[in-house]
Amino acid sequence: MRVLGIETSCDETGIAIYDDEKGLLANQLYSQVKLHADYGGVVPELASRDHVRKTVPLIQEALKESGLTAKDIDAVAYTAGPGLVGALLVGATVGRSLAFAWDVPAIPVHHMEGHLLAPMLEDNPPEFPFVALLVSGGHTQLISVTGIGQYELLGESIDDAAGEAFDKTAKLLGLDYPGGPLLSKMAAQGTAGRFVFPRPMTDRPGLDFSFSGLKTFAANTIRDNGTDDQTRADIARAFEDAVVDTLMIKCKRALDQTGFKRLVMAGGVSANRTLRAKLAEMMKKRRGEVFYARPEFCTDNGAMIAYAGMVRFKAGATADLGVSVRPRWPLAELPAA
């Protein structure tokens, strides 16, 4: 059984083909980073137009890469939300149209379920149950996962997501967009302990996050200490340490609350090396396991949508003839498979 996956929720056009016996057969990705760099962030209208230009050619490339034709595809999965409404509509329209033309089922996929299941693409996939840390530019959530579609929200950011805070602080430090990875690179040159940032909401019970205050703290620190290269690196180090420590503290609480021994982290920020190292060390001390996808599957991609589509297809999920998307779509609303 082979599923074509289409991802167009934001600023990456991702196309992949997944086979339930052979695994990933094709994976094509186009990033719009250069398109949006001059604006310092994603411009929704530009993103939508670029998806229109790139989606079909990438599908053709994926078929070529896999050596397959349309007749070999058993279902078409597409990201139906959450995300930018115009960008979502491009992928949904193409996906639904291809499914109709090829006479195969269309499978709407939740973008964050795609991220959550991305580690399943690895050679050593996690088993249920586990705590999932979904950490990206748009979301920071802790989820109790006991099966496909069996998701309980334990905590989430009440303001900025961790990835958004990374990008905003990077901009304050004079780094280009997207700044998160550049900030982490700069932080590696920083001196630990010169500056100490707060660990937001760790001094009270609960599993919610708040990262907007760290951006303000960074702005004040930059104002008071100047912007020479070493100072900027030290501020980047302090900021990254604060975010990573906050995520780690909340993960500990979630694991204690659920009693689970497995931690899965997914989303763009899960590619952060410092975060990976700290959580791996934490889980080793707890005699548990931590799982994450390879870096290219942490950011938005078609492979995770193709895989999630396969899982949902086997559970009987299909879309009707209409094209609909959900820019806001709580993960907990998904049905169990």
UniProtKB/Swiss-Prot annotation:
It is found in: Cytoplasm. GO terms for biological process: tRNA threonylcarbamoyladenosine modification. Binds 1 Fe(2+) ion per subunit. It catalyses: L-threonylcarbamoyladenylate + adenosine(37) in tRNA = N(6)-L-threonylcarbamoyladenosine(37) in tRNA + AMP + H(+). GO terms for molecular function: iron ion binding; N(6)-L-threonylcarbamoyladenine synthase activity. Keywords: Acyltransferase, Cytoplasm, Iron, Metal-binding, Transferase, tRNA processing. It is an enzyme of class 2 (transferase). Its cofactor is Fe(2+). Gene3D superfamilies: 3.30.420.40. Signal peptide: none annotated. Substrate binds at residues 134-138, 167, 180, 272. Pfam families: TsaD (PF00814). InterPro entries: ATPase_NBD, Gcp-like_dom, KAE1/TsaD, Peptidase_M22_CS, TsaD. Its main location: cytoplasm. Required for the formation of a threonylcarbamoyl group on adenosine at position 37 (t(6)A37) in tRNAs that read codons beginning with adenine. Is involved in the transfer of the threonylcarbamoyl moiety of threonylcarbamoyl-AMP (TC-AMP) to the N6 group of A37, together with TsaE and TsaB. TsaD likely plays a direct catalytic role in this reaction. Belongs to the KAE1 / TsaD family. This is tRNA N6-adenosine threonylcarbamoyltransferase. It comes from Escherichia coli O1:K1 / APEC. The gene is tsaD.
